[in-house]
Amino acid sequence: MAFDRNAEEDLAYGHKPVLLDGCLTGLNIRPDGIYVDGTLGRAGHSLEIARRLSGGGRLICLDRDETAIAAARERLADYRDRVTLVHSNFSRLGEVLGELGIPGADGMLFDLGVSSPQLDDAARGFSYMHDAPLDMRMDRTAGLTARDVVNDWPYEELRRILLEYGEERYAPVIAKHIVRAREHTPIETTGQLVEIIRGAMPAQALREKQHPAKRSFQAIRIAVNDELGELQPMLRAAADHLNPGGRLAVISFHSLEDRIVKKTMQELATGCTCPPNFPVCVCGKKPKMKLVSRKQITAGGDELSYNPRARSAKLRVAEKL
């Protein structure tokens, strides 16, 4: 399918869905099927799924951000007969489907990470480009904020998340500067944090193309929202709640997420793990899924021209056996 988007509609809702054609092809949508969008956002993917469903089909949409739910309700109004919106994190996938009386789905989509509207809304505190209160919560009813992390977490924990979640090579010195700065005054805003990070980095690093705070902000955001901790359990729950032949499509935006998605899908697609010298299988392990494509799907030139934020997006698809 050639890349084709309604630019005016995407602009109106402040979000351009990434790898949309790949997702729709990967999900192999049936008009009467049951589908789950576990990361609703501004409903760019959900809208196109809903358009392909008949009155007998159903789409369950989850998001932990109540602002996203409100915007999506308006955007999906024409399909309210087949769409159910749920304010919930995808970590509760099994519970939500159980509460709705849905034993299995024919396809599930998860578009990981922070959405464009969350980044662009300065008040949410996700962006290092705008000065705002340190928040970074995808679910604003949750307790932990970025302010809590940078002001309360000990040096070792700060160093660990900057290194593991941000893959920041200057993690030790940045963590030291954060701890030193907060001893004098609490770190309240993204602007304060950016300046602390700048002050911690050597001149050579400040001359690089990438913004000096990018990796640190990613790390803190992941910690606030427990993004990596919830990912593998969600993927396994999704596999358990797919009908045979159902598809799981996952979009990731950085190597940490993609490694987890790739590894978990490969494990779900692997059968017997007995040593090769065993005459018969004793582990009893059978594959739950098969990989639809062994390589990740990435954006083509047309999509990148329309939406540069798709550059780092990777799509992987697996099918329930």
Which residues does each predicted region cover?
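S-adenosyl-L-methionine-dependent methyltransferase catalytic core, i.e., the SAM/SAH-binding region
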Residues: M1-L321
